[in-house]
Amino acid sequence: MSQEKQVFSIDLAGRQLTVETGQLAKQANGAVLVRYGDTAVLSTATASKEAKNVDFFPLTVNYEERLYAVGKIPGGFIKREGRPSEKAILASRLIDRPIRPLFADGFRNEVQVVSIVMSVDQDCSSEMAAMLGSSLALSISDIPFEGPIAGATVGRINGEFVINPTVEQQEQSDIHLVVAGTKDAINMVEAGADQVPEETMLEAIMFGHDEIKRLIAFQEEIVQAVGKEKSEVKLYEVDADLNQSVREMAEKDMHSAIQVHEKHAREDAINEVKKRVIEHYEAQEADADTLGQVNEILYKIVKEEVRRLITVEKIRPDGRKGDEIRPLASEVGILSRTHGSGLFTRGQTQALSICTLGALGDVQILDGLGVEESKRFMHHYNFPSFSVGETRPMRGPGRREIGHGALGERALEPVIPSEKDFPYTVRLVSEVLESNGSTSQASICGSTLAMMDAGVPLKAPVAGIAMGLVKSGEHYTILTDIQGMEDHLGDMDFKVAGTAHGVTALQMDIKIDGLSREILEEALQQAKVGRMHILDHMLSVIAEPRTELSAYAPKIITMTINPDKIRDVIGPSGKQINKIIEETGVKIDIEQDGTVFISSINQEMNDKAKKIIEDIVREVQVGEIYEGKVKRVEKFGAFVELFSGKDGLVHISELALERVGKVEDVVKIGDVITVKVIEIDKQGRVNLSRKVLLKEEQEKEAAKEENKQEQQ
């Protein structure tokens, strides 16, 4: 293998993708620099030389954003990147999920894959470059990785599928799909869609897989040219004699324990069998390694029996049929002071979602590598330890919580009304109160209920369901509404959310090779049936969004002003707008096109603020009549306030019909008089007349008197 710099290129969606090896990060087991358009990502893979003494595969995938990639300096006092952004965490998960299944069972060496985003071209996805780079870094290294994998983004514009759409194309697309896999099979899907039919989503997945095959062939050429020989690694294996001994002791009782229907009772029964076996070996003074192997064998017994029952005997751990959904229960409006709340329970999974409405100024500001600067719709997901009856420290959200929150956000966003139709920021928080599988989908259902309770005029209600698959040889069973054990021990986790009209979000992780199109199609159709059942239940609780918002939600008035007048409303250094806010207690948000949003929980204060702004931007027209207060008196006339912020002069000669010797003889400060605008000079000064109106009144009276005399 050569250590010289080598460059490989391929066309990807009309833009050149280049891979450079042999120059950067040469002490890593594998490293590549991927350039896609002007996007550049350095991906590295490193592994420990010895296996770790753990009972899982210690893989870490990091997608690291650097703000220099878009020519920005980080905000704040420290001026360096801090904790990863939500987008970076989601990208790390996106890369981790298709890579993780491609390491051999029993491989316990620590592996770290790091992708550093060094330059960003918004039309060339840094996530897709990082996914390809991560796969290549592992593939050309000596780490025993059974790849390569590749990923592709698929959009749909006017019915035509597009690979890796540009920013402009993404705005027109009704599908936002990321698909990843090997040359033989898909193993990861992440999608958002605008109520798209299941058949179309399946076509999009297959379209993306065709592009994946081409990218994998490209990677295989690079591996052939620069790849290292894979190192021999000792895989973790249990002792054969110990395996037989434990199985003889535990299998029969474990099979009975697995078929206990209730979750906690089943866990207790399984743990009782485990405890008895462990105590037997502890009595024989078995060392820690032996006890670790015993635990591994017991886990395999549970896994094998659960899978056998599902695939061969068609029996699920809780006794349900394959397409049966657990009992459903829902409530809305259970928290009095919140703007909207929804409680959704499915079996032993329960989510309480709360909807909060805010002004447009409450949007989340995004300071990242993307073009999006803010978002007005947010969904946050919390998974406290008590939801599974455990104790652990209460810390901030982890990767899983951020991922589940983002999935819910993606599922619900297509049905959120536009800013024009509903000028509010919407924040949803889903608190998982009980967990036995499918909590992310329960949070979607709970959030729909909460928004309908809050009076958000959704385009359509959304429900979500998690599907599973257990495949053994030719036998397979698709499961609707999987619970925790089925998710953990099964071959597929397939989450589908949508409305009655189509899919809005889809997330799939597959742990096995060779999943056929037919199985995927069957799973999607079975998910649709389940989704419709859940939607019917939800609509029986609240049929449509409430017509009135909560008394505690902000009321928003929308008005439009001339964009040239925005600076008058804001005033020097914000003096004018801050004065209005201080006087009325409202929030004011002004768009560049002159749209003004005024919000507070007090409608009277909203109206007051609107009146003040109307007065500030109001244009005085010649011929208009005003009732104004005298603000100042000079020798030459009186200054009259027509409305807030606008004065005019009544010259002494225009105060009365008769000649006026002294202004104070007619008006004094504080008097309210009626005046007419007779001129606006070139300097914008407003000249007023009281005399004109008095003369008009005099003429009317004279005409009336004349008519009266004629009638006599």
UniProtKB/Swiss-Prot annotation:
UniProt keyword list: Cytoplasm, Magnesium, Metal-binding, Nucleotidyltransferase, RNA-binding, Transferase
PROSITE patterns linked: KH_TYPE_1, S1
Binding site for Mg(2+): D487, D493
Catalytic reaction(s) noted: RNA(n+1) + phosphate = RNA(n) + a ribonucleoside 5'-diphosphate
Predominant location: cytoplasm
SUPFAM superfamilies noted in UniProt: Eukaryotic type KH-domain (KH-domain type I), Nucleic acid-binding proteins, Ribonuclease PH domain 2-like, Ribosomal protein S5 domain 2-like
Entry cofactors: Mg(2+)
One CC-aspect GO term: cytosol
KH domain span: 554-613
EC top class, as a word: transferase
Pfam families attached to this UniProt entry: KH_1, PNPase, RNase_PH, RNase_PH_C, S1
Function: Involved in mRNA degradation. Catalyzes the phosphorolysis of single-stranded polyribonucleotides processively in the 3'- to 5'-direction.
Protein name: Polyribonucleotide nucleotidyltransferase
Organism this protein belongs to: Bacillus cereus (strain ATCC 10987 / NRS 248)
Gene: pnp
